[in-house]
């Protein structure tokens, strides 16, 4: 089915059809593989939808329960043909026997009627009774009694299975899916693809009555015309004669969703300015909708397609009109009286003309819009569908169909054929959908019961929503109806002299006898089922059924209803014949385009794209070859411009508007998954493939031989194996297992990811459905593993690494492997020690430092571990991968970093932060050392300024035993190494007034052990008069090297007679700075803040300036004073003695 009432916006020059749906009825056949394709898909009436049901079904438990007597089936010789593949180009032969005729023999039993009704597996034993003709009362014969309490029919076992079968319907139902047709979307392809259609009808000719004809069953098989003659004679045949009719083989059309517009038909108001004379018809044709065989299968819904291409003269103005006429024997809608024609539109959907339809004259009048005022050289196209008007053609006949656009006519001769009844023994029935009311959602079905006027015993007709196969089997089809107590069912008897129209459509029921009240009608026979009990009959009857249907989605019609006739044959077995009708839809289309400039005579090129299954480059050499739709075909003009179309459902493409003498290039895009077939595989230019690109020159005619073929590109696989390479040799060993859940990524040659998978429990992986080409395979390293070495041996046994390239060239590639081994773990660390000798080396006597915090960072600077040294100063970090790390030592409080990198790496200190790289081994060389600051070294800075002018009278008794060894070098730069052992016990009472300013700088490194007790009382800047009596026993050994810068002014008056009045004025400038490093720490007082370039503190003179001369004077003065004191003490000692 093509576009339905769609308006597409495409390029100006293109052609597109504007579609509109209509309805038709179709006799349905199930089990065939026929497909209806063409420019439009006609909906219709379907029958025999489950024709091959018995070929595919099996006995079920329900069938066994429903059968107690032997069931002898007669299967026709065409049973195997029902599932045979249908060739679209070969029609089915006429008068073939159908497998749908099933004969169920009923064995006599002793059961009563009540038993039959209560037990589905029991049948009564009775002999056939004689039935009078024209007896329409319901039969009470036990043999033919139908149990109306059961909903569905029992499925009959095929192939002469011996089963006892009653006439009681069972609960088993055949599920059959009919084959659906393809739907064409190419609006320019007016040639429908033919499909097998049913032929050979068997009905009574109302216009040619004849005498009764006696004919045997064999004669009917061999001479189908005998059956037609039998129907037309309307005679009573011998009861032993069993007419056989060919089961229809028409296709089951695809259900179509379509937009449907209906309106009450009104005569077209033809505008006064008809411009038919300004319309130039360039092409028009009449084609058959199903099969181009000259036969219209009217009951199969076969439609007539009228296409017309025409040009609109530039003189046409808005408001002008043109006409399109249908043949009087056709009608736009088969089962409705309402029809609105499609609009003529351009490719963009803009309306060129709007139409109205006159049902009385069967003429469309199109009125042009202002489109014709705005564009020149407007081209238009119409595609109209119609059906045989059964009112005008009640019986089979030959017709000359004539259609016309703007009074330009075209004709085609066709033969109209109608359906024949389905016959099984005395059961013979046929039906059609005769009317559709989309407003009330009602459908009318007209059923011919016993149209052959056979002597039918115990006749029952069942009407069912859904499908009924020719053999009477029920199935779920393409649609449904609602059958309940509100369903209208009328029964009419056909008099012996009356003829039934072969069209199966009754326009005036009043001409037949209404016997509705003379038969038993059960409208609740089952779910959506009704039953009519006719009893014994030998006349034809018409049943009119008006049932409701439930509409589907927008414009979606799926209406299907079947009927089944059941009779008792001469063997007291039930015989069934079934018929099914279905409603589908079809569309009309109209389209056009406009061009700016007039064009010269133009030509077209194109033809066909097909799937070349056998790859030989020749069309039609393999039955599986088929057309390829939607293949992009590009036309390149001489000036380099291009335009493209896609192939339709029939593989057809076409470019029009081409100029004579010009050269064009046609290129075919290779569909995804296909490859171009062999070029020029034969000398027949109509059958070969021209390749992906072909150049053609227009030589005064169309060229419709530019074909190309493609075949499906073969698909391949790629992959193999991921394993644990325990021995790390890069070779797959037999005892090495696969690794599960390894992620593998596949990329194409452009780097695009086209697939991802994981290895299975065996380590296997694969990628499927791949084309030839180059691919990249990437393996993700599993957690805890390391890639093994790659490319060590044969391609199928080595490791290809983490990333590898796989090439597919007309074969699978199973060589892409990757191996991994479990990643080892490493440790790092060592030692933090107390470097007592500060040499930056670990000595055997030096001990570790406990509780030093050590931090480990990874290459990104992230902390991955922290620990503390143990009591031996040891630390370590474990479970480390190879990589770069940083170790950070936190300096202990009160300690100083020792020197780094002074000796071997495992014995020196590496400092507070150490970068380390682990490569497949532990690293225990990361050490660090610290030492303690020597705060016991005496650092004495003394600044004393003493200015004394005193008169001191001192009486001192001093007993001193002192052993002093002093080596002192005092200058601005002094280095003193003193080792003294002094034991002093002195009692000194000194009252002195001293003004002293001394600057002493001493830098000494000494190791001393001293015990000193000093009591000093100093009053600076004092004037003291002391009278001192001193008795001293002193032994002093002093080695003093003193360089003193002192300024001493001494005025001393000494009386050697133990009475000494000394007036001493001493000015001393002394700066003493002592820096001592000793094992014993003694606190010292700070020196003055002023120091020289040797870092010696200096005292400033009171004047604020430095005076070396004054210092020297002080030195000498001090010496003299000392000598004087010695003399004085010595004299007094003598006196005392």
UniProtKB/Swiss-Prot annotation:
Keywords, ordered alphabetically: Cell wall, Peptidoglycan-anchor, Repeat, Secreted, Signal, Virulence
Polar residues bias spans: 77-89, 158-207
Signal peptide start and end residues: 1-52
Residues modified as Pentaglycyl murein peptidoglycan amidated threonine: 1103
Pfam families recorded: Big_8, Gram_pos_anchor, SdrD_B, SdrG_C_C, YSIRK_signal
Sequence segments annotated as region (Disordered): 54-249, 675-697, 896-1112
Membrane topology term: Peptidoglycan-anchor
Highest rank taxon of the organism: Bacteria
Location relative to the cell: Secreted, Cell wall
Domain (CNA-B) ranges: 602-714, 715-824, 825-935
Start-end of Basic and acidic residues biased regions: 61-75, 92-106, 130-145, 216-241
Biological process, per Gene Ontology: cell adhesion
Propeptide feature ranges: 1104-1137
Compositional bias of kind Acidic residues: 903-913, 930-1076
SUPFAM superfamilies: Bacterial adhesins, Hypothetical protein PA1324
Statement: the UniProt record of this protein carries the keyword Nucleus: no
Low complexity composition bias: residue spans: 109-126
Function comment: Specifically interacts with bone sialoprotein (BSP), a glycoprotein of bone and dentin extracellular matrix. Could contribute to staphylococcal osteomyelitis and arthritis.
Protein name: Bone sialoprotein-binding protein
Source taxonomy: Bacteria, Bacillati, Bacillota, Bacilli, Bacillales
């Amino acid at each position: 089915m093509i576009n339905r009432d769609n308006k597409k916006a495409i390029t100006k020059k293109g052609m597109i059809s504007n579609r509109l749906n209509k309805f038709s009825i179709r006799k349905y056949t199930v089990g065939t593989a026929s497909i209806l394709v063409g420019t439009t898909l006609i909906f219709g009436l379907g029958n025999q939808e489950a024709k091959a049901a018995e070929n595919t079904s099996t006995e079920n438990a329900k069938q066994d329960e429903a059968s107690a007597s032997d069931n002898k089936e007669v299967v026709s010789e065409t049973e195997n043909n029902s599932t045979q593949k249908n060739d679209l180009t070969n029609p089915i032969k006429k008068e073939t026997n159908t497998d749908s005729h099933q004969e169920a023999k009923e064995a006599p039993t002793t059961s009563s009627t009540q038993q039959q009704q209560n037990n589905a597996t029991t049948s009564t034993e009775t002999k056939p009774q004689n039935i009078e003709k024209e007896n329409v009362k319901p039969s009470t014969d036990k043999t033919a009694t139908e149990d109306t309490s059961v909903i569905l029919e029992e499925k009959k076992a095929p192939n002469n299975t011996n089963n006892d079968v009653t006439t009681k319907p069972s609960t088993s139902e055949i599920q059959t899916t009919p084959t659906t047709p393809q739907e064409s979307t190419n609006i320019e392809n007016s040639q429908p693809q033919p499909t097998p259609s049913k032929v050979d009808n068997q009905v009574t000719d109302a216009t040619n009555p004849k005498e009764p004809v006696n004919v045997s069953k064999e004669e009917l098989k061999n001479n189908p015309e005998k059956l037609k003659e039998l129907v037309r004679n309307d005679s009573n045949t011998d009861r032993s004669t069993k007419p056989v009719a060919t089961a229809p083989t028409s296709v089951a059309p695809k259900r179509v969703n379509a937009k449907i517009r209906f309106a009450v038909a009104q005569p077209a108001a033809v505008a006064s300015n008809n411009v038919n004379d300004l319309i130039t018809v360039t092409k028009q044709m009449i084609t058959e909708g199903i099969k181009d065989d000259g036969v219209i299968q009217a009951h199969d819904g076969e439609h007539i397609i009228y296409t017309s291409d025409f040009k609109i003269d530039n003189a046409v103005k808005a408001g002008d009109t043109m006409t399109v006429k249908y043949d009087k024997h056709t009608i736009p809608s088969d089962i409705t009286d309402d029809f609105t024609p499609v609009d003529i539109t351009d490719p963009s959907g803009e309306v060129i003309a709007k139409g109205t339809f006159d049902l009385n004259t069967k003429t469309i009048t199109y009125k042009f819009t202002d489109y014709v005022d705005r564009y020149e050289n407007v081209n238009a196209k119409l595609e109209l569908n119609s059906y045989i008007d059964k009112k005008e053609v009640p019986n089979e006949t030959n017709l000359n169909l004539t259609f016309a656009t703007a009074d330009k006519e075209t004709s085609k001769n066709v033969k109209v054929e109608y359906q024949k009844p389905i016959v099984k023994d005395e059961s013979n029935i046929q039906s059609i959908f005769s009317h559709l009311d989309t407003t009330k959602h009602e459908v009318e079905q007209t059923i011919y019961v016993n149209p052959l006027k056979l002597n039918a015993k115990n006749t029952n007709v069942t009407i069912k929503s859904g499908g009924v196969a020719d053999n009477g089997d029920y199935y779920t089809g393409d649609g449904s109806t609602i059958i309940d107590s509100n369903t209208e069912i009328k029964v009419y008897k056909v008099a012996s002299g009356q003829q039934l129209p072969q069209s199966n459509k009754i326009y005036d029921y009043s001409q037949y006898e209404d016997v509705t009240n003379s038969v038993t009608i059960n409208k609740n026979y089952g779910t959506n089922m009704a039953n009519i009990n006719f009893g014994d009959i030998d006349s034809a009857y018409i049943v009119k059924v008006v049932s409701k249907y439930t509409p589907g989605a927008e414009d979606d019609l799926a209406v299907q209803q079947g009927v089944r006739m059941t009779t008792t044959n001469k063997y007291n077995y039930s015989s069934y014949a079934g018929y099914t009708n279905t409603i589908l839809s079809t569309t009309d289309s109209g389209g056009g385009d406009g061009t700016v400039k007039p064009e010269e005579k133009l030509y077209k090129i194109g033809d066909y794209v097909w799937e070349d299954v056998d790859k030989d480059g020749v069309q039609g050499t393999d039955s599986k070859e088929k057309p390829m739709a939607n293949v992009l075909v590009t036309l390149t003009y001489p000036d380099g411009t291009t335009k493209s179309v896609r192939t339709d459902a029939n593989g057809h493409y076409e470019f029009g508007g081409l100029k004579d003498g010009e050269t064009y290039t046609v290129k075919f895009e290779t569909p995804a998954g296909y490859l171009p077939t062999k070029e020029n595989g034969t000398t027949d230019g109509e059958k070969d493939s021209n390749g992906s690109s072909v150049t053609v020159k227009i030589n005064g005619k169309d060229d419709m031989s530019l074909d190309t073929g493609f075949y499906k590109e073969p698909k391949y696989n790629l992959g193999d194996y991921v394993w644990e390479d325990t021995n790390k040799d890069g070779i797959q060993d037999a005892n090495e297992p696969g690794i599960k859940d390894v992620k593998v990524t596949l990329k194409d040659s452009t780097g695009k990811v086209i697939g991802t998978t994981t290895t299975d429990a065996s380590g296997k992986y694969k990628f499927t459905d791949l084309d030839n080409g180059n691919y990249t395979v990437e393996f993700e390293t599993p957690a805890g593993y390391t890639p093994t070495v790659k490319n060590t041996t044969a391609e199928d046994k080595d490791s290809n690494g983490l990333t590898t390239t796989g090439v597919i060239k007309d074969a699978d590639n199973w060589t892409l492997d990757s191996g991994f081994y479990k990643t080892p773990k490493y440790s790092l660390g060592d030692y933090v020690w107390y470097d007592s000798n500060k040499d930056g080396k670990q000595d055997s006597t030096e001990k570790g430092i406990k509780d030093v915090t050590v931090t480990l960072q990874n290459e990104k600077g992230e902390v991955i571990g922290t620990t503390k040294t143990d009591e031996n100063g040891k630390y370590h970090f474990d479970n480390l991968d190879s990589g770069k790390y940083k170790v950070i030592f936190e300096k202990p409080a009160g300690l100083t970093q020792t020197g780094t990198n002074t000796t071997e790496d495992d014995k020196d200190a590496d400092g507070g932060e150490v970068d380390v790289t682990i490569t497949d081994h532990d690293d225990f060389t990361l050490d660090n050392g610290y030492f303690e600051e020597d705060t016991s070294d005496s650092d004495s800075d003394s600044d004393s300024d003493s200015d004394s002018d005193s008169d001191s009278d001192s009486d001192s008794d001093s007993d001193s035993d002192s052993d002093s060894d002093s080596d002192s070098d005092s200058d601005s730069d002094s280095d003193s190494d003193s080792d003294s052992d002094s034991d002093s016990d002195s009692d000194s009472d000194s009252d002195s007034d001293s003004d002293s300013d001394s600057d002493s700088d001493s830098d000494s490194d000494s190791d001393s052990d001293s015990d000193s007790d000093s009591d000093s009382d100093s009053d600076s800047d004092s004037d003291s008069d002391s009278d001192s009596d001193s008795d001293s026993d002193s032994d002093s050994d002093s080695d003093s090297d003193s360089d003193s810068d002192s300024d001493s002014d001494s005025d001393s008056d000494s009386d050697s007679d133990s009475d000494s009045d000394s007036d001493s004025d001493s000015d001393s400038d002394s700066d003493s700075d002592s820096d001592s490093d000793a094992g014993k720490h003694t606190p010292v007082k700070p020196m003055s803040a002023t120091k020289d370039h040797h870092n010696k503190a200096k005292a400033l003179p009171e004047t604020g300036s430095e005076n070396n001369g004054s210092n020297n004077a002080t030195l000498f003065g001090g010496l003299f004073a000392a000598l004087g004191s010695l003399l004085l003490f010595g004299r007094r000692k003598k006196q005392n003695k």
